[in-house]
């Protein structure tokens, strides 16, 4: 798995299945950013999401391009980008639709994303 503080970009189903299985087994909170290269709000939130990954080192952060992995986007019922899905042990526990930095931050705190000490 990627090191702590990184966003794991999955470009194939094989990589996604392997990485999400490892993350689920770790019992850590998982946040998936469903994004698209043509989506301006997605481009706006991407560096913010990367900073969150550095800040919340006990959370596993994924990035999925909906055009590359349509099957995964459909499985998670993604209808707008960006959509952020929060999971624990394979279960969806929350979601945020839109580039809502504060709401994403609140959900990270709510679901156990402990902030690393600086």
Curated annotation (Swiss-Prot):
InterPro entries: Thioredoxin-like_sf, Thioredoxin_CS, Thioredoxin_domain, Thioredoxin_H-type-like. Induction: By treatment with salicylic acid (SA), abscisic acid (ABA), iron, copper and UV-C. Induced by wounding, oxidative stress, infection with incompatible P.syringae and treatment with the fungal phytotoxin victorin. Belongs to the thioredoxin family. Plant H-type subfamily. Its main location: cytoplasm. Interacts with MDH1. It is found in: Cytoplasm. It comes from the Eukaryota. PANTHER family: THIOREDOXIN, THIOREDOXIN H5. This is Thioredoxin H5. Disulfide bonds join 39-42. Keywords: Acetylation, Cytoplasm, Disulfide bond, Electron transport, Redox-active center, Transport. Disruption phenotype: Insensitivity to victorin phytotoxin. The keyword Metal-binding does not apply. One of its GO terms (cellular component) is cytosol. The active site is at 39 (nucleophile), 42 (nucleophile).
